[in-house]
A protein has these predicted regions:
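Glycine-rich active-site/cofactor-binding loop and its immediate structural neighborhood
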Residues: 107-143
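Long amphipathic alpha-helical segments
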Residues: 3-106
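Peripheral docking tails and interdomain loops at the edges
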Residues: 199-241
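Long, low-complexity, intrinsically disordered polar/charged segments
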Residues: 101-116, 182-188, 193, 226-227, ...
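Cofactor-cradling patches in redox/metallo enzymes
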Residues: 132-134, 142, 147-205
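Residue-level detector of anion-binding/catalytic polar loops
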Residues: 54, 139, 190, 213
Length: 241
């Protein structure tokens, strides 16, 4: 069922339905982002929050789309590396701002480790996934980008996660993903591993070659599929939606 909200965002009426921001509102935000205007971006996000939007909606409907769009513009040489990096830094700041305003639920008893493998410097998508799991009651360890295999193994031994998520943006790092997953299997054959990121979005079937249990298109998809795997273990009464 589709829902519609009339919001006052950045001094204009913004219509939010299940799938997207009103184009004029999105374009306004995206122009602030391209300009590197962090103050206006924060003001826009604050208005969204005050109007009733939560982390899930803002991450998926606004920030995720903006990241994809800025990446496309960079690939087409429309924006510079500096502009792309500035936009990414602003979005990371916005994510911190949004996260701090969320009320965390009671723990559901499950642990998730999220990492980006060696040579993978793009971590913002993985951070979104980590935040999604945390606001749904998971105990999350997000260890960031460029993590050596030995350190992933060390975290598995110390943390004993039920799930491990590994992100890969650049296709040339896929072998690093496989190295991580091979090490995970040797360390704990029972833990479930999922993968995501731009490299897998372009070719979802690669998750099988990498040895993962499933591929997730985004944070929302990762959460839904993770719950499905855990439900198979008889955890229905422990997971909250």
């Amino acid at each position: 069922m589709y829902f519609v909200r009339l919001l006052r965002v950045a001094n204009m009426t913004c219509i939010i339905n299940k799938n997207k921001f009103d184009e004029s509102s999105y374009n306004k935000f995206f122009s602030y982002l391209l300009e590197g205007n962090r103050r206006q971006c924060i003001s826009f996000i604050n208005d969204c929050i005050e109007s009733g939007l939560g982390l899930k909606e803002i991450y998926i409907l606004l920030l995720q789309r903006a990241l994809h769009d800025i990446g496309d513009l960079w690939q087409k040489n429309v924006v510079s590396v500096a502009q792309e990096h500035l936009a990414t830094a602003i979005i990371q700041r916005l994510m911190m701002f949004i996260y701090q305003k969320q009320a965390l639920p009671s723990p559901n008893g499950f642990k998730v480790l999220i990492a980006c493998p060696g040579n993978e410097l793009h971590e913002i998508g993985a951070r979104m996934v980590a935040d999604f799991f945390e606001i749904h009651g998971f105990d999350v360890k997000f260890v960031g980008s460029n993590i050596p295999v030995r350190d992933v193994v060390g975290q598995i031994k110390a943390f004993s996660p039920d799930l491990i998520g590994v992100s890969c943006t650049m296709a040339f790092n896929l072998h690093e993903i496989k190295n991580v997953i091979d090490a995970v299997r040797e360390t704990n054959a029972n833990v479930k591993v999922f993968v995501g990121g731009y490299a897998f979005n372009k070719n979802p079937g690669l998750y099988k070659i990498a040895g993962a249990d499933f591929y997730a298109a985004d944070a929302e998809d990762a959460l839904a599929k993770a719950k499905s795997f855990l439900l198979e273990r008889g955890a229905a009464n422990e997971l909250s939606c």
